[in-house]
Swiss-Prot record:
Reactions accelerated catalytically: L-alanine = D-alanine
Entry's Gene Ontology cellular component terms: cytosol
Residues annotated with N6-(pyridoxal phosphate)lysine modification: 35
Keywords: Isomerase, Pyridoxal phosphate
Enzyme Commission no: 5.1.1.1
Function: Catalyzes the interconversion of L-alanine and D-alanine. May also act on other amino acids.
Active site: 35 (proton acceptor), 253 (proton acceptor)
Matching NCBIfam families: alr
Molecular function in Gene Ontology: alanine racemase activity; pyridoxal phosphate binding
Gene3D superfamilies: Alanine racemase, Lyase, Ornithine Decarboxylase, Chain A, domain 1
Positions with a binding annotation for substrate: 131, 301
Name of the featured protein: Alanine racemase
Annotated metabolic or biological route of this protein: Amino-acid biosynthesis; D-alanine biosynthesis; D-alanine from L-alanine: step 1/1
Length: 358
């Protein structure tokens, strides 16, 4: 490996975070959500790391589930978007996947499958987010009409719009609306994602779906959430070149950064083709030789430039942390006007994922 741009995946952090979040709800079962290639961390590796603590996994689409099966992951897999086409019902049965059904068309597809070749299903209720799910007013009738498709593994699920915001009352209204129909139907429920598990005790039901928190992402607007989680990814690269420029000289495309004094500029081998956000502003932090340096100029496809004037002995080959244990990913996301979820999932496939234990 010539280029030193890598995403280090911290296996111990993944295990710690999952166990810490699951411990908040000891009466519930918890599953790790590994959709979007485990939020950019590598779904197969993450599933292998967590398979002894997470009895099920969740993905978004059937292709993600099959990739786990092809890698030898045998635990049940919940497909959160259900079937996109009728043929996926058969695929789910063949691969021991649980489909989360959110509309009657999907139930009709399932009904058309041979009776002995139907996968287990969950049912999703729209409690107010208005993306996917049966309407609150329809779900009881749907469970009666399609009772023959349900099994001992069927769960009623919903999803929150604002669970990370402890001051937003909409989550309480979603919980109340969902609880009314769930109590009437009488099936086990799955409500909590990572933020809800931390912030909303009433949402901790039969199954909690632990996603971004497992990877060290932000789970709450509160300052003290009562659980300590650690970043599971360190994105790092190395310095390709160091040069000194005079006051008044510009750096990068568009000359967006201009030196106010003689400055030392380091070029780093990572860019937006690797998933480092192009919209990062000047002064976005990185870590070099134990000190913070700052973005100077626009992010290029394959490189960034940083101001290291204040750091001694910077040289070619020095490691640069873009985010991770010393530079919080949330801070970088704020500099790019986005969220940590997006940064994690956009790390491109040309960046190797290197799994490490402490």
């Amino acid at each position: 490996m010539s280029r030193q741009t890598q995403a280090i995946i911290h296996a111990d952090a993944l295990l710690h975070n999952f166990k810490a979040l699951a411990a908040i709800a000891p009466s519930s079962q918890s599953m790790a959500v590994v959709k979007a290639d485990a939020y950019g961390h590598g779904a197969v590796n993450v599933a292998r790391i967590l398979q002894h603590v997470s009895s099920q996994f969740a993905v978004a689409i059937i292709e993600e589930a099959i990739a786990l099966r092809d890698a030898g992951i045998s635990a049940p897999v919940v497909v959160l978007e259900g079937a996109h086409q009728a043929k996926e019902c058969q695929m789910a049965f063949q691969h021991n996947c649980i489909l989360v059904m959110h509309c009657e068309e999907q139930l009709q597809w399932l009904n058309n499958c041979p009776e002995n070749q139907r996968p287990h299903i969950w049912l999703k209720v729209d409690s107010g987010m208005h993306r996917l799910g049966f309407a609150i007013s329809d779900i009881e009738d749907m469970t009666k009409k399609y009772r023959h498709l349900l099994s001992e593994q069927t769960v009623i699920a919903t999803h929150f719009a604002c669970a990370d915001d402890v001051d937003n009352g909409f989550t309480a209204s979603q919980l109340s609306a969902f609880k009314r129909v769930a109590d009437a139907i009488g099936l086990p429920t799955s409500v909590a994602n990572s933020p809800a598990t931390v912030n909303w005790p009433a949402s901790r039901n039969a199954w909690n779906r632990l996603g971004v928190g497992v990877y060290g992402g932000a789970v709450s607007t509160a300052n003290n959430v009562g659980v300590e989680i650690y970043p599971a990814m360190t994105l790092r690269s190395s310095i390709l070149a160091v040069r000194t420029i005079a006051a008044g000289e510009g750096v990068g495309y568009g000359q967006r950064w201009v030196a106010s004094k003689p400055s030392k500029i380091a070029t780093v081998g990572i860019g937006y083709a690797d998933g480092y956000p192009r919209h990062c502003k000047n002064k976005t932090p990185v870590m070099v030789r134990g000190k913070r340096a700052f973005l100077a100029g626009r992010v290029s496809m394959d490189m960034i430039t940083i101001d290291v004037t204040h750091i001694d002995n910077v040289s070619v080959g020095d490691e640069v942390e873009l985010w991770g244990q010393n530079v919080p990913i949330q801070e970088v996301a704020a500099c790019a006007d986005t969220i940590d979820y997006e940064l994690m999932t956009r790390v491109s496939q040309r960046v190797p994922r290197i799994v490490k234990y402490l």
